[in-house]
């Protein structure tokens, strides 16, 4: 819907004084999408490519391949011309690398880790294709002294738990003034303790399990690193939450 609305007023051609600026389809777009928001990211990329008049080859994460298969079935039933949408499942270092290196692919759009982004950029360089990247980040959530400390901290911590914390925009690094530190810790602790983890099909659960074992082990490892480096653990820990 957002893409259709944008197309209603989007100018593919502009007259600028004595010249014309025309935006044309770039060609074949290789798409590499993540496991944490699989359908969201695929639909965003696919809708944009169709709107621009591009064909595409999409590689979903090997951890969440079924969303790609479901989307392919939907697109097939919708009647999109054959060859416009192409789905290839597989591992990033194999299929992702093949897409990045292929001279038949004019552009790569990747949403994923910084490590994956670097690999894609390097593999794409020899063919001088365009590369669009949305990678991991850790921008600070800065709470100023004149903010509503309770609302700001509670909201910030709650956002960290969205999608079981598996979100690139999760504001997991919060900065507050020394004067508000103790209050912020108290609020954060309260929000964390009220956030229940368990079966995602249980309406009382606010968080389900981590997507895969490797990611779970990484989260546990990062918690332990924080403790080892002197951080104070105020909620949760390295043990598997009750109910999971």
Label every model-predicted segment.
Residues 9-151:
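Rossmann-like NAD(P) dinucleotide-binding subdomain of oxidoreductase/dehydrogenase enzymes
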Residues 107, 115-244:
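ALDH superfamily catalytic-core signature
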Residues 1-6:
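Long amphipathic alpha-helix in the N-terminal Rossmann-like dinucleotide-binding domain
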Residues 7-10, 210:
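Low-complexity, intrinsically disordered/propeptide-like segments
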């Amino acid at each position: 819907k957002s893409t259709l609305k944008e197309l209603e007023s989007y100018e593919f051609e502009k007259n600028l004084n004595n010249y014309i600026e025309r935006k044309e389809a770039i060609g074949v777009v290789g798409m590499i999408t993540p496991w944490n928001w699989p359908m969201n990211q695929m639909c965003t990329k696919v809708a944009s490519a169709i709107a621009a008049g591009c064909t595409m080859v999409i590689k979903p994460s090997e951890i969440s391949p079924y969303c790609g298969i479901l989307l392919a079935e939907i697109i097939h039933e919708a009647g999109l011309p054959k060859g416009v949408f192409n789905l290839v499942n597989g591992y990033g270092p194999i299929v992702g690398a093949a897409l990045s290196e292929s001279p038949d692919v004019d552009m790569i759009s990747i949403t994923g880790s910084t490590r994956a982004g670097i690999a894609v950029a390097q593999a794409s360089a020899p063919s001088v294709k365009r590369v669009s990247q949305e990678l991991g980040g850790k921008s600070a959530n800065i709470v100023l002294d004149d903010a509503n400390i309770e609302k700001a901290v509670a909201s910030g911590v709650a956002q960290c738990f969205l999608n079981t914390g598996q979100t690139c925009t999760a504001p997991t690094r919060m900065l507050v003034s020394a004067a508000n530190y103790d209050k912020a810790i108290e609020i954060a602790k309260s929000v964390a303790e009220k956030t229940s983890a368990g079966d995602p099909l249980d309406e009382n659960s606010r968080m389900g399990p981590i997507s895969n074992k490797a990611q779970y082990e990484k989260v546990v490892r990062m918690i332990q690193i924080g403790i080892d480096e002197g951080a104070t653990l105020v909620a949760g820990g390295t043990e598997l939450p009750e109910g999971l």
